[in-house]
From Swiss-Prot:
PROSITE patterns: IDH_IMDH. GO terms for cellular component: cytosol. Its cofactor is Mg(2+); Mn(2+). NAD(+) binds at residues 76-89, 282-294. This is 3-isopropylmalate dehydrogenase. Homodimer. It comes from the Bacteria.
């Protein structure tokens, strides 16, 4: 029986980078006889334009029926003035929550070929390989009540809620420990337990889960210190587990240690490792349609999909090897280009990865 993959290009540069990722996926499908069937649909602004909502019910049904979802990016200034609850980003939040994609894996890896691209000194970031495990469907982004109210003095006050249940914390902590077990057996849990009640429960539950993983060295760090340490000495970290808000911020910070967010994929998984895969970067509307966006993060998201949702290690390794070969050849999109390298556009980069994969 064939495996179903839903392709959601999204907005901005999403369709451009997705075209290249699909080329790589189709070659891998043929080369390794993976038996994938691809279907395409819309999400975000593209869905608003077509259906009037950022995620149509039929699209959500297709996502539920699929074995994995590959996403480009959502959002753009075209939709910034519409009602908040139907903006493109709400489609992304909805598909995550409706599919139960609670565990977000965001690697921050510095490719040796791109050591000069980081804004930090080479000796600080050389060999960097961090995995941030972010809780994705709880916390302040989904908490209620939220809104704006008028105080007795006539002033408006906005408020949000940051709730976490024991079960939500326990399941994401388990993902963090599981990832640590197959990596360096080190896990740093990041919270704000000196201030937030939700973080105090977070720390308590993480400590409980740690008893099931005696081989893993567990440490705790406040989020403000973690942000500082990511810049001061990032290689002290191997796996970081944290909540939705902190993970959103820290994973973007960690991505820039590598020199370009355009290189970094991500995975969002449910309890059975069925997942949605997307680049860490956004829709970059300022460069959309120019053919200069870096497709490598989306291509590497295909590799993560093969690895985590389908356990196709050989095919996943081959795609990562193909990307490394292309970087060895000095081929670069503008965001990772440096003097003496060959600057190419989106399509040329995709073609180069396809050629490298074909020759492996």
């Amino acid at each position: 029986m064939s495996k179903q993959i839903l392709i959601l290009p999204g907005d901005g540069i999403g369709p451009e980078i997705m075209t290249e990722a699909v080329k790589v996926l189709e070659l891998a499908n043929e080369k390794y006889q993976l038996g994938f069937e691809l279907t395409h649909d819309v999400i975000g602004g593209a869905a608003i334009d077509k259906h009037g909502v950022p995620l149509a019910d039929e699209t959500l049904d297709r996502a539920r029926a699929a074995d994995a979802v590959l996403l480009g990016a959502v959002g753009g200034p075209k939709w910034d003035t519409i009602e908040r609850d139907i903006r493109p980003e709400r489609g992304l939040l909805k598909i995550r929550s409706q599919l139960g994609l609670f565990g977000n894996l965001r690697p921050a890896i510095l490719y040796p070929q791109l050591a000069d691209a980081s804004s930090l000194k080479p000796e600080i970031v050389a060999g960097l390989d961090i995995l941030i495990v972010r809780e994705l469907t709880g916390g302040i982004y989904f908490g209620a009540p939220r809104g704006t109210r008028v105080l007795d003095n006539g002033e408006r006050q906005a408020y949000d809620t940051l709730p976490y249940s024991e079960s939500e914390i326990r399941r994401i902590a388990k993902v963090g420990f599981d990832m640590a077990m197959v990596r360096g057996k080190k896990l740093c849990s990041v919270d704000k337990a000196n201030v937030l009640a939700s973080s105090q429960l977070w720390r308590e539950i993480v400590e409980q889960v740690a008893k099931d993983y005696p081989e893993v060295e567990l440490s705790h760090m406040y989020v403000d210190n973690a942000a500082m340490q990511l810049v001061r000495a990032p290689k002290q970290f191997d796996v970081i587990v944290t909540d939705n808000l902190f993970g959103d911020i820290l994973s973007d910070q960690a991505s820039m240690l590598t020199g370009s967010i355009g290189m970094l994929p991500s995975a969002s998984l449910d309890t059975a490792n069925k997942g949605m895969y997307e680049p860490c970067h956004g829709s970059a509307p300022d460069i959309a349609g120019k053919g200069i966006a870096n497709p490598l993060a989306t291509i590497l998201s295909v590799s993560m999909m093969l690895r985590y949702s389908f356990n196709l290690t050989d095919a996943a390794d081959a795609i990562e090897k193909a990307v490394s070969v292309v970087l060895d050849q000095g081929i670069r999109t503008g965001d990772i280009w440096s003097e003496g390298k060959v600057k190419v556009g989106t399509q040329e980069m995709g073609d180069a990865v396809v050629a490298a994969l074909r020759n492996l």
